[in-house]
Amino acid sequence: MKKEVRKVRIALASPEKIRSWSYGEVEKPETINYRTLKPERDGLFDERIFGPIKDYECACGKYKRQRFEGKVCERCGVEVTKSIVRRYRMGHIELATPAAHIWFVKDVPSKIGTLLDLSATELEQVLYFSKYIVLDPKGAILNGVPVEKRQLLTDEEYRELRYGKQETYPLPPGVDALVKDGEEVVKGQELAPGVVSRLDGVALYRFPRRVRVEYVKKERAGLRLPLAAWVEKEAYKPGEILAELPEPYLFRAEEEGVVELKELEEGAFLVLRQEDEPVATYFLPVGMTPLVVHGEIVEKGQPLAEAKGLLRMPRQVRAAQVEAEEEGETVYLTLFLEWTEPKDYRVQPHMNVVVPEGARVEAGDKIVAAIDPEEEVIAEAEGVVHLHEPASILVVKARVYPFEDDVEVSTGDRVAPGDVLADGGKVKSDVYGRVEVDLVRNVVRVVESYDIDARMGAEAIQQLLKELDLEALEKELLEEMKHPSRARRAKARKRLEVVRAFLDSGNRPEWMILEAVPVLPPDLRPMVQVDGGRFATSDLNDLYRRLINRNNRLKKLLAQGAPEIIIRNEKRMLQEAVDALLDNGRRGAPVTNPGSDRPLRSLTDILSGKQGRFRQNLLGKRVDYSGRSVIVVGPQLKLHQCGLPKRMALELFKPFLLKKMEEKGIAPNVKAARRMLERQRDIKDEVWDALEEVIHGKVVLLNRAPTLHRLGIQAFQPVLVEGQSIQLHPLVCEAFNADFDGDQMAVHVPLSSFAQAEARIQMLSAHNLLSPASGEPLAKPSRDIILGLYYITQVRKEKKGAGLEFATPEEALAAHERGEVALNAPIKVAGRETSVGRLKYVFANPDEALLAVAHGIVDLQDVVTVRYMGKRLETSPGRILFARIVAEAVEDEKVAWELIQLDVPQEKNSLKDLVYQAFLRLGMEKTARLLDALKYYGFTFSTTSGITIGIDDAVIPEEKKQYLEEADRKLLQIEQAYEMGFLTDRERYDQILQLWTETTEKVTQAVFKNFEENYPFNPLYVMAQSGARGNPQQIRQLCGMRGLMQKPSGETFEVPVRSSFREGLTVLEYFISSHGARKGGADTALRTADSGYLTRKLVDVTHEIVVREADCGTTNYISVPLFQPDEVTRSLRLRKRADIEAGLYGRVLAREVEVLGVRLEEGRYLSMDDVHLLIKAAEAGEIQEVPVRSPLTCQTRYGVCQKCYGYDLSMARPVSIGEAVGIVAAQSIGEPGTQLTMRTFHTGGVAGAADITQGLPRVIELFEARRPKAKAVISEIDGVVRIEETEEKLSVFVESEGFSKEYKLPKEARLLAKDGDYVEAGQPLTRGAIDPHQLLEAKGPEAVERYLVEEIQKVYRAQGVKLHDKHIEIVVRQMMKYVEVTDPGDSRLLEGQVLEKWDVEALNERLIAEGKTPVAWKPLLMGVTKSALSTKSWLSAASFQNTTHVLTEAAIAGKKDELIGLKENVILGRLIPAGTGSDFVRFTQVVDQKTLKAIEEARKEAVEAKERPAARRGVKREQPGKQA
């Protein structure tokens, strides 16, 4: 037996849960091998993970057949089982890095953001890698403020905290720095021309563009000087004096050779070479001028240079050592000289300097590295490197600590204040930071930074969610709820609701971040080969593929240790791939199909919207055993029949027919029978006979889309017909809103006997005669039927001799013989009004009269005298015939004569009343027979009457011309008055419109007067008068004048259309007309959609309302007023009869009422007669209002009780338990919505025709509880009005005892209250629509409920739609279902929390019982959409709108759906808990007396057995709580 589902719970899945669902990890993005068409291993369709493609067959084919079931093939690893497992076996993708679930990120408000107290923007910045979030600040300080946990940091801020504060100053090419690399700088110091440091710190070069190497040169050289002039020293520094010569001195060569002169910046070397070998090297200091040139050959003793005055060392050369040899008066100095020779190297962007500033290099050391070894710079000799022209200077905030001895830290270490750096503890750090050891300058730099833990992406968010202590957070937020600021409290409440949802449901916040992504079973995302060898695939496969590709790439990059920026980008792309899979297009641009702009359908798209799983597949499935065809009229059918084409019936009833054929021996077995049916030509007559037998006693359902109310589907007994069309009974057309201009209908077969019984009893067309919306007949004569019946019951009034008086009947008859008086002319005989016909033809009984008609003696329309049941009736044979027709149909002549009025012609309304009265007095079956009779005779007489219309039937009255001339004269006067300045332009416009409206009205009256007096049998007139077709406005346009037209803007043209259609319109008139007509058409199209949407919203808000019990026992009631204030005078007047009927009919009296001497007891169902009695009593001033039970005050949870609901209007009897009255209410309100909309185009956009612009939008505004645009100012208190007027504004004061309330209004406000008026709270002070929310605050829920019902009714009444108040009340009750907590008392509720009134009341009862403080609340008014979304059933809400939001909220709270309403049960494929599916009906058994006796005896025995102790041992006892 199938287990019955009791509840459905939705929750978050933990990563472990997701992995436990999975049958294996999908590692590759491959799907199917296009050659073998087999799934790829580890791919999205892998058979090892998801199961075999063919039943009981592994992938390699080693194991086939069912006997190997459950075995896993050792070759291919596929389990041998049914292929259906591919519909529910899931896989998973293990993510390389966690990813957030977009529903919990982008929902409004974001669930993750709410928990972590991050805004949506902040959360997005972290998840998509544009900002860091702090997990552990570790004492970090940013701009003098301590960094906090969960603070967001930009890349710069993070780098500053993690790697120190630094600023980069770019330098233009060719500009050299003014500070050295590694030099300490202060704020404001110039780093380069025009570049100033904004920071204290250390300047570091970035990408120097030029390197200067100062090579150290050494040379041993000699110099002979006069001894007396020599300034003796052991070494000479650059620029020091060597000698002071008193007179010029010539320095001579001491060897012969070739001169080689090497000049320095100052001074020079002179080398003498012999055969290329140097023989002597001389030093020429500053002050000594060479006398020889390079390459000159010199002799020994030849002067080489001349010296004068001071001789000194060049500025860049020093003598490290001096050896002196004195020879007589001269001294020969051997000098060991050292100097630097700079060499510059350009550094290109692709090259890299590998030594620091000031570094000493040896010959062969690399200074600049490059990709091409040829471009590298290698040291030519020993030297010192200097860096120049950096691309930029980086100033790092760092402390510099010089040291002497050994360093105790190394580069990259992190230190805190007080940590030892060098020199055995003498040098210590006094800041947090990262160490850089500079051995060139013997310093330790500590770059000020922190070991802060801040991260990006879902990983960081997951860590924070894991660390959340929900209990502590709850306590903290409860404290915050005591804060005086309302905004702070509201924010805390929202967070607290989420926290509690997690706490109560047992979900963990970190589960909102995915570590593994589940992979949908492959048969739910199929891939099929289409013609041409290409593959058609579900969009999900593309989305999964993207995800797997990115995931695998990220894994690879992580394994390779790729740079942070690449990893970060890949992680972001992975997050975006997960987002696209879950909800494509929710963030950023949607992922589209390659080659088109169509966004891919993600999992969210598959669920939500009209084409989503909920609405397309769960709430509305296509069904088998159905067909559709065009409908044609079937006038010969009975009300409960429909004509079904034979071929269609054959297909629909095929299984039944096959069985019957086998039974009757037409075919040996079912297979043969099926083959016989497939060969269409071979179908024998026996088959058709068998089909007749099969359908005998069965019913089928006919449906016409759009199904706006329950009468859009009705059951009929099929009658087999030739042809291809379904034949429909004319009288059900109104319920279906069907006509025969090409409409199609669908046929469905209820299969089970239960379904057949239900269709036959509940849905048969003959059982659905009254409208559930108003209780009026829906199956009633219309069109031709009315015309025929009106034709025979109309009487002739002739003019000839009318008004003549005769003394005796004989005189009158003689005058008639002479042709002076017509048969039907009204005359007086002996002072009594009569006619010749009544005198001449006196019949003893109705049969005689009808016989006379048959013999052509009198016409059906002549007035004659008939004796009947002891009475003399003056009536026409036609009316007698009509009475006879009714009598035969209802099989009760007495009742028939009571039902019909013989003194009026039978038109639309009288026929409707006849049907209704017949229903009340005679019941359903006889009424159905009556309808068939009326249909038959109506068609017969409308045919034989020969009534049809031609152009000449549109008769134009003589008076029209005169009325138009009169109007033109008045028009001239208005224009003159305007010209002379007596009227403003607006007044002139209004007066012209008024004039033409009056003129049109006069012409209309003239048209009808003309018809009545001169052409009473004019077909046009007959049709309009009888209600068969056309209305006075259309007749006016045909015969009178079209009148005023509307502009596209909705205003009215002041020039009317003077012509009628009979006369034809001028070009200008035609043009003017076209606007309105087109607007009507456009309106219709647009508003049909709005109306359908409204119906959908109404159904969604009311579907759970079912009649659940007989009496809820409430003492509350509503008072239906019988009077209402006049719009203009504000004095009370009796409400319209129809309005009172809509409020009272079928209700239960809540208090006893005695009127006009009749006592109506409490608990009585008010019939229409009772209502009429109450109206009479109101007219007599005996009663002002009637106390009745109402759904608004019903105490039944999730529904209403019989008493509060009253009559089932479609049956005119108390409603049955289990009736889905909520849906009936929604349909009753929604169905006319489309009529309202479509009403426009009938009048072709004539001005004055009620255009629904006030209609539907107003209804929607009321049901959505929107604040109206032009809203009235309402008084918030009871009091007396005082008005003060100033230059720019009006002040209206409402004053009550010791209290006054002021309302400031603009000068042009149209006041409703006068100075000194007494007003009540909630009463409008100015014109406009009342804001229901304000009314609720001022006057309470009852006032709002009455206001909404009344305002909605106003719109429907304006359109002539009858609708019972209780339908609107049911919807309004659902709008008023919720309350807001103002003080939680001793409960766990929160201030501002919204929940159902029932729940609060139940909670309060419990609190009071426990002696605790109850919850204080205020009523809320919610629009139907919001109310529907707030329902407890998450299945119902999710299938309505905002699917993702509803499911997100429900999942977090771990909501359980109790399956109370209808939608949730339909979604799960259960019987709906209404009608025959309600427990009341399902568990009610119908038994005969014998069974009843047996049950009674069994019950007695059970009681006795219970009283006897269980003596025998081993008696199996039922476990408590288990159902036996």
Swiss-Prot record:
Positions of Mg(2+) binding: D739, D741, D743
Organism superkingdom: Bacteria
Catalysed reactions listed for this entry: RNA(n) + a ribonucleoside 5'-triphosphate = RNA(n+1) + diphosphate
Cofactor: Mg(2+); Zn(2+)
Cofactor binding annotation: Binds 1 Mg(2+) ion per subunit.
Keywords linked to the UniProt accession: DNA-directed RNA polymerase, Magnesium, Metal-binding, Nucleotidyltransferase, Transcription, Transferase, Zinc
SMART domains: RPOLA_N (SM00663)
Phylogenetic lineage: Bacteria, Thermotogati, Deinococcota, Deinococci, Thermales
EC number(s) from the headed UniProt entry: 2.7.7.6
Residues reported to bind Zn(2+) 1: C58, C60, C73, C76
Pfam families: RNA_pol_Rpb1_1, RNA_pol_Rpb1_2, RNA_pol_Rpb1_3, RNA_pol_Rpb1_4, RNA_pol_Rpb1_5, RPOC_hybrid
Keyword Metal-binding: yes
Described purpose of this protein according to its UniProt entry: DNA-dependent RNA polymerase catalyzes the transcription of DNA into RNA using the four ribonucleoside triphosphates as substrates.
Binding site for Zn(2+) 2: C1112, C1194, C1201, C1204
UniProt cross-references to InterPro entries, sorted A to Z: DNA-dir_RpoC_beta_prime (IPR045867), DNA-dir_RpoC_beta_prime_bact (IPR012754), RNA_pol_asu (IPR000722), RNA_pol_N (IPR006592), RNA_pol_Rpb1_1 (IPR007080), RNA_pol_Rpb1_3 (IPR007066), RNA_pol_Rpb1_3_sf (IPR042102), RNA_pol_Rpb1_4 (IPR007083)
GO MF term list: DNA binding; DNA-directed RNA polymerase activity; magnesium ion binding; zinc ion binding
Subunit structure: The RNAP catalytic core consists of 2 alpha, 1 beta, 1 beta' and 1 omega subunit. When a sigma factor is associated with the core the holoenzyme is formed, which can initiate transcription.
GO biological process, one term: DNA-templated transcription
Name of the molecule in the record: DNA-directed RNA polymerase subunit beta'
Region (Disordered): 1501-1524
Family in the record: Belongs to the RNA polymerase beta' chain family.
